Each structure stands twice: as C-alpha cells, then as structure tokens.
C-alpha cells in the first residue's frame, strides 16, 4: 500500500525523515519495502519550459507539418517542427527541450535533435497527454497570454514533490490499511521513543443537516451480512474537476483523479480505511435503499461493463426495482454519479468480511473496497467518515445536506475485553518490562485500561483491532512497539537437545538425491500446490474430473490442487525464458493430489482423496554452451534418461530388475515408463508435446521426468547395501557392430545381453548409431560395447569368444541382428 509522507504528517506530528519513518514502521511490524520521491505529475515536468511561438510556416515537404521558431526565454529562438493542427504564431506553449524525458504510462522516451522531412527540429511542442496533465491529444497546449517564456513548466503548474512509502500490510492488520491507521502505529512508536507527538484527525463537529428535501429510506434485510449501514443525501451538487490539492493527494499515491465527488470517496478510503460509495440519488427508484440478496442467476452489469450472474449469497445494494451495487465489492454501471448528477446519496457501511470475501472471489474481483471489507474495517468509524464526506462534498461540489443520517445498526460493535498479566508478558517476551512502560504502550495503541492490579491489567481493545482478542495478541503488540531489538539475548539458553532419534529414511534419501542433482547443475524450485484447473481441460492423462477443487479459491489461477508437478515447472521455465535464461535444469519434490469419485464413502469423507509425493525433473536448452573448447550442444532426452538412471542407482535399485515400456500421450510426444516387475509405476520421462509447450509460450524442447517417490521408497525397502573387494583381475571389452531393424531399441539389446551372461557381463553401452547410405531400407547400425570381468580369474580368449558367440546367436534369433 502506498503511503504519502506529507499526508501522514497531517495526522501525527514528527520530525523524522522519510527513510527514518520507513525504518520506524518496519521495526513495529509494518514492513516498508522502499521510499520513492514522487511528483504530482510523473517526471516532475523536468526539462519542460514555457515558450512563445514567434513564427509558424508550412513545411515544404508535408501537407500537415509546420516549421516554427519558439522563444524559450534564453536568447536565440529555437526551431521546432510541429504536427499539431492548432499551432500558430503568437501562442504561449509548453516545450520539451533536448534531453527531456516524457512518459507514456510505464514507457519513457527522450527528446533528441532530429530531422523531420529534411528540416531540423530541436525539441517538441507538447499536448496535454504527452506531459501528463490531461488526456487530450487533439492539439498542443495553448496557455494564457500572461504566461512568461522561459518559465519552468514545473513552476507554472505548481508541481508538488512528496515521498511514497511502500508499506506491506499483512492480512491481520486491517486497521493499518489507511494513512490514519499507519499514523496510529507511528504515534505509538514516537511515544515509546520519548518523542513529543499528537494524533489528530479532522473534526466533523460542523456537520449539520440543512433541510429534509431529499429523504431516502434505508432498509437492511440481511443484518448478518450487513451489521451496519448508514447514508445521507446532498442535494444540488455540481460534479466537476477536483481542486488541485485533492488531485495531488491522489496522484501521489498512484490514483487517477476522476471528479470531485468520486475523488472525495477515494480520499476517505485511503485516509481512514472506510470505503464509501456515491449513488446518483435520482436513480434510486422508489426513494429507498434496500440491502438484500438477489435470486440465483440474476444478471447485474458492473462499472466495468461486464454482465455478471449473481449468487444467492451475494449481498446487493438495491432500490425498489433494481440492484445498484455489489455490496462492499463493486458498483453498478447505471447507479453511480456522473457529470450530470445533481443529487447524491453517500453510503458508509460495515459489511461482514466473510460475505465480502466470498463474493469477491466468486466474481474474480479485487477492489480497494473489498480489500478492506474482507479483512475487517472499523465498524465505529462509519458515521465519522460519512459526516466528513458529506461536509467535503458540500465544500467542493456545493449543495446542501438534505437528510438526516440514516444509520441502521443491528448492535453497536463492542470492545474486546482482554485480561493481561505481567507474568505472561515477561514469559512470552523473555524480558521484564516495567509496568509503566506496558501501560504507556497499550494506551498509545488506544487500548483502554478498565482495571489495574499488581498482577496485571484488564484492557478494552477497540473493535478495529480484529487481530487483538487474546492476551498473547496484546503481548505481541507490546513487543513490536517496545522494539524487538530492545530484547537482549540472555546469557544462558535453556533447551532440550538429543542426538538420538529415528531418522526418516525417505527424507535422508531425498536430501542425498537433491545434493546429487545440484551437483549435476540442477536448481531446486518450489511451486504452489494450488494451480489453474484450466491446465487440465481436455487431458486424458490427468482428467479434470480427478481434480481436487477448492470451494473458495483465492483466484481463478489458484482454484484446484495440482495432479502433476509438470505445469509448475513449465511456468518456471517460461518465466526464466522471458528473462533471457533459456538453458535450465530444474527439480522439485512435492505432493500431487487426486480425486476419485468412485471411492466416495458417506462414512469416510476423505476416501475419494489421495496424495502422492513426486520428484519432477525438467531439462531444456543447451547442454554445452559455445566456447573455445566446445560448440553449442543442445540437451536431449538421453541426458534426462541418464539423470533418472543415476537416481535409481543412488537409491540402490538394480536397473536390470526394472521393466521399461513405451508411452505416448497428451503430455509426452515420446516417452518411456519404468515399472517394477510387479507393475508399479516408478517413473515416466520423455519429450513434452509441442501443444503443451505452446500453452506456456515455451519455444525450446522440454524434457520432463516424473518419479513417484512413494513407490520408489517401497521398491527400495528390500535393498541392502553390500560391500565387496575390488577385482584384482582385468576387465575385457568387446565391440559388436549390429545391423538391426529400425524399430529395435537399445534397451532390447541390453536386456538380451544381461539374460545371456548374468555373471561376467558388467556393462553394456551404445557408442554409435548409424542410419543412411550403404544400409538396407528399414535398417540401422548399432555399435555396442560389452564389458566382461571375472572376480576370481583372468578371462582368456576362449572364454570370451564363447560368451560373445552365444550373445551374437541370441541377438540373431530374437532380434534378427546381423554382424556388420
């Protein structure tokens, strides 16, 4: 949330610099990410000056350009080519000089000397939208005749500077979602640190009802969802541009001024955290505001022009005939104030956080109002803010306050009563804090001391502190204001440590595999278990019907639990690729979740749900980057296969005991599965389909492996580590060049080889593949190396030849192989 330094000073007096304020707020739990100097107009109009057009003639090479000379108040006139249709001699204009930076949203461009259709142009005569003082681009700005050439534009437009503090508000601190809320905490900090400070806010004592010419009735039909609703009317207003001071306040914190009435409501919400809504009173049919729910499926068009279907639990603000606003979330298209509005009805309410949160999530909306209502605002500030808003409307838009405040309140919000003992304060904080200091802190935080004893205090905590309802909550507040850095580390630490205990084998092996992968150049990633259900639309390998859906998702992008780690990794790859980092190796350990409707059991609610622990590997980009020693070499699925095999070896699995099969589905264009002999799937790895990559805007090939960690742990239960002496006898290598059908895979050769010679054959490796000229159609050549070794003697040629002859015969019989 953006907090204005100068605005903050209106509520609490201090002599701290912006950086000191940021440090103070961070120290008391309102973490401030940064301090930025800003101006009411982006860029501060630096480099812009007022000029006078001395001459203006048509460009010889254009039918719409003009060549002008402009007096910038610095002596010699400046030549500028201008394309605006309204440029003329004698005008006072705004000129961007060489080197000036102009902003278009987040983009910036610099004014440079240029030639336009062969004529030199030194600068630019500007339109409103080009310098950020308006939205018109119909022509250049023409200033009044009394504008003085050479005057800096920032002085002419009275550009103000301020500092914006980026305060990160945690979900429990709804009370700090405003300038006044932050000022309250800063005031407590100042008092604790011995500084003279006072907390103030504008008085509304001057509020007075002038007549009863526009009386609008208020009815609340659902007091659970709306415990308090208040409204007042102002008649005879003029909707127009806000005064400069109000526009500047909003611009500084990043808001765009709209008109005086709307700007007042935005000012109030950012000043005091109370969302307001302004209705055109003449559009309230029947002269009554009704707070209620609507039938399921009712359509309603919001301010953004989107037609939405309402849920029966969406609280609505209605008139006698129509819905006007989604309560606490978003206004309607046809009920708000416009430039033609003359009478307004101002709403100030307290809506139940849960109702607002669920409605906002259902419609995928996140507004300034819903952000505050769903966290819980101060129910007792509604009337104050309503009075202040009405007074401001009267002052800035004219008119008269034309009704009594209609305040429908089921029951006034009560303070939270908390019993606090000094002993517990000392126990939780770890330091004895004097009672007077504790009383000073709680008082500065607007907690009332209802009773006091030698043992502690009875406190009344204001209802806007929704996060402080227990003694431990109060103690946390005491600690953050007292200062975490003021609690010394004790000279002795009491702890209970043991060096004995059960070691989780799975965790230990996970760490070993993680270290192995990191050593191979992988980076570990951690993705959210929540993901987007749309990823699974139309998939057969991971059907949408098996998704574990969230009843109340944070957003449409986080509305289900993941069935696979794949999509999170592809998001990470896309994120890195967009930042010019395309050579990637990722791994992730995480749970995957599954729903099976066939397992539903009324007596076991969780029966249809399951989760498995998986390891995902992603490889993409180059395996070797271009250098003096190596040319570029792209990674391949075989590299991924090696990583998978090495993981199996690290876990102690015998690769020859596993069953490998082919796979091609909507995830992989080509892949292999690795199963136990009992049919349990241990891993799948292969090439991700182009269609899948396109959905994530990934251009490079991606190779993905999915290892079921749970099944791997089961598979290695019987694995035992054995040790043996290194053989004293040499190993012998024999190579074969085999002519085979193209459909034959190396895995088949490997399997036959190990079945043929189980004792002496130690390794089978493929070192060359050839397909092309001089081979029969449909054939390919494999060059395969066989490593033989006897642990008890040196192998002689006769023994080796016997093994190789048997091996060749089996390859010929089973695969139709021929020696080349």
UniProtKB/Swiss-Prot annotation:
Mg(2+) binds at residues 467, 473, 476-477. Residues 727-820 form the FDX-ACB domain. PROSITE patterns: B5 (PS51483), FDX_ACB (PS51447), TRBD (PS50886). It catalyses: tRNA(Phe) + L-phenylalanine + ATP = L-phenylalanyl-tRNA(Phe) + AMP + diphosphate + H(+). It is an enzyme of class 6 (ligase). It comes from Bacteroides fragilis (strain YCH46). GO terms for molecular function: ATP binding; magnesium ion binding; phenylalanine-tRNA ligase activity; tRNA binding. Its EC number is 6.1.1.20. Tetramer of two alpha and two beta subunits. Its main location: cytoplasm. Keywords: Aminoacyl-tRNA synthetase, ATP-binding, Cytoplasm, Ligase, Magnesium, Metal-binding, Nucleotide-binding, Protein biosynthesis, RNA-binding, tRNA-binding. Residues 413-489 form the B5 domain. This is Phenylalanine--tRNA ligase beta subunit. InterPro entries: aa-tRNA-synth_II/BPL/LPL, B3/B4_tRNA-bd, DNA-bd_dom_put_sf, Fdx_antiC-bd, Fdx_antiC-bd_sf, NA-bd_OB-fold, Phe-tRNA-ligase_IIc_bsu, Phe-tRNA-ligase_IIc_bsu_bact. Its cofactor is Mg(2+). Binds 2 magnesium ions per tetramer. It comes from the Bacteria. Belongs to the phenylalanyl-tRNA synthetase beta subunit family. Type 1 subfamily. Coiled coil: none annotated. GO terms for biological process: phenylalanyl-tRNA aminoacylation. It is found in: Cytoplasm.
């Amino acid at each position: 949330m953006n907090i204005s330094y100068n605005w903050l000073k209106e509520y609490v007096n201090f002599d701290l610099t912006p950086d000191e304020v940021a440090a103070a707020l961070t120290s008391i739990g309102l973490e401030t990410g940064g301090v930025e100097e800003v101006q009411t107009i982006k860029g501060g109009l630096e480099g812009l000056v007022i000029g006078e057009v001395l001459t203006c003639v048509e460009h010889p090479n254009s039918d719409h350009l003009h060549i002008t000379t402009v007096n910038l108040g610095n002596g010699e006139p400046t030549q500028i080519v201008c394309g605006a249709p309204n440029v003329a001699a004698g005008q006072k204009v705004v000129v961007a000089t060489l080197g000036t930076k102009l902003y278009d949203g987040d983009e910036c461009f610099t004014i440079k000397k240029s030639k336009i259709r062969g004529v030199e142009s030194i600068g630019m005569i500007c339109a409103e939208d080009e310098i950020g003082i308006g939205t018109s681009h119909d022509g250049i700005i023409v200033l009044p005749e009394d504008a003085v050439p050479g005057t800096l534009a920032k002085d002419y437009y009275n550009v103000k500077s301020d500092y914006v503090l980026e305060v990160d508000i945690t979900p429990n601190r709804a009370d700090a979602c405003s300038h006044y809320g932050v000022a309250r905490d800063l005031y407590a900090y100042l008092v604790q640190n011995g500084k003279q400070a006072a907390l103030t806010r504008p008085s509304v004592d001057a509020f007075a009802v002038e007549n009863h010419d526009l009386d609008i009735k208020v009815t609340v039909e659902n007091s659970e969802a709306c415990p308090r609703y208040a409204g007042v009317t102002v008649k005879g207003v003029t909707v127009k541009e806000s005064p400069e001071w109000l526009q500047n306040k909003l611009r500084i914190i990043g808001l765009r001024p709209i008109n005086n009435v709307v700007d007042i409501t935005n000012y109030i919400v950012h000043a005091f955290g109370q969302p307001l809504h302004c209705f055109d009173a003449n559009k309230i049919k029947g002269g009554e505001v009704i707070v209620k729910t609507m039938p399921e499926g009712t359509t309603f068009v919001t301010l953004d022009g989107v037609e939405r279907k309402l849920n029966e639990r969406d609280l609505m603000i209605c008139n006698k005939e129509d819905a006007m606003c989604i309560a606490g979330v978003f206004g309607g298209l046809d009920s708000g104030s416009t430039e033609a509005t003359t009478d307004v009805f101002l709403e100030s309410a307290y809506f139940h956080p849960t109702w607002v949160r669920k409605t906002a999530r259902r419609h995928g909306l996140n507004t300034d109002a819903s952000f505050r209502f769903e966290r819980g605002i101060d129910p007792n500030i509604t009337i104050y803010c309503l009075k202040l808003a009405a007074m401001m409307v009267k002052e800035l838009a004219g008119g008269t306050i034309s009704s009594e405040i209609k305040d429908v309140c089921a029951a006034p919000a009560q303070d939270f009563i908390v019993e606090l003992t000094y002993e517990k304060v000392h126990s939780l904080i770890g330091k004895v804090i004097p009672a007077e200091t504790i009383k000073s802190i709680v008082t500065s935080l607007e907690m009332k001391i209802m009773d006091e004893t030698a043992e502690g205090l009875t406190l009344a905590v204001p209802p806007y502190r929704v996060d402080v309802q227990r003694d431990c909550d109060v103690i946390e507040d005491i600690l953050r204001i007292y200062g975490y850095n003021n609690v010394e580390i004790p000279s002795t630490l009491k702890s209970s440590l043991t060096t004995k205990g059960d070691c989780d084998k799975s965790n230990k092996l996970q760490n070993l595999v993680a270290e192995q992968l990191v050593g191979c150049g992988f980076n570990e990633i951690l993705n959210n278990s929540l993901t987007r259900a749309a990823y699974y639309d139309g998939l057969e390998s991971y059907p949408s019907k098996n998704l574990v859906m969230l009843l109340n998702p944070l957003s449409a992008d986080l509305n289900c639990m993941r069935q696979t780690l794949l999509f999170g990794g592809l998001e990470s790859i896309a994120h890195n690729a967009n930042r010019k980092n395309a050579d990637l190796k990722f791994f992730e350990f995480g749970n995957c979740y599954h729903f099976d409707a066939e397992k539903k059991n009324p007596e076991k609610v969780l029966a249809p749900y399951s989760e498995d622990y998986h390891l995902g590997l992603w490889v993409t980009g180059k395996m070797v980057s271009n250098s003096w020693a190596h040319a570029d070499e792209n990674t391949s699925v075989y590299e991924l296969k090696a990583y998978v095999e090495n993981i199996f070896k690290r876990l102690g699995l015998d690769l020859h005991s596993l069953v490998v099969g082919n796979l091609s589905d909507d995830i992989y264009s080509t892949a292999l599965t690795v199963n136990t002999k009992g049919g349990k799937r241990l891993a799948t790895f292969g090439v991700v389909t182009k269609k899948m990559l396109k959905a994530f805007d990934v251009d490079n090939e991606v190779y993905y492996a999915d290892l079921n960690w749970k099944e791997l742990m089961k598979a290695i239960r019987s694995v035992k580590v054995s040790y043996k002496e290194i053989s004293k006898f040499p190993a012998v290598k024999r190579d074969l060049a085999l002519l085979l059908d193209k459909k034959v895979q190396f895995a088949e050769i490997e399997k036959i080889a190990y079945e043929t010679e189980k004792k002496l054959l130690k390794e089978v490796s493929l070192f060359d593949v050839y397909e092309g000229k001089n081979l029969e159609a449909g054939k390919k050549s494999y060059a395969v190396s066989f490593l033989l070794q006897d642990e008890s003697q040196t192998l002689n040629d006769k023994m080796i030849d016997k093994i190789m002859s048997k091996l060749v015969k089996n390859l010929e019989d089973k695969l139709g192989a021929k020696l080349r």
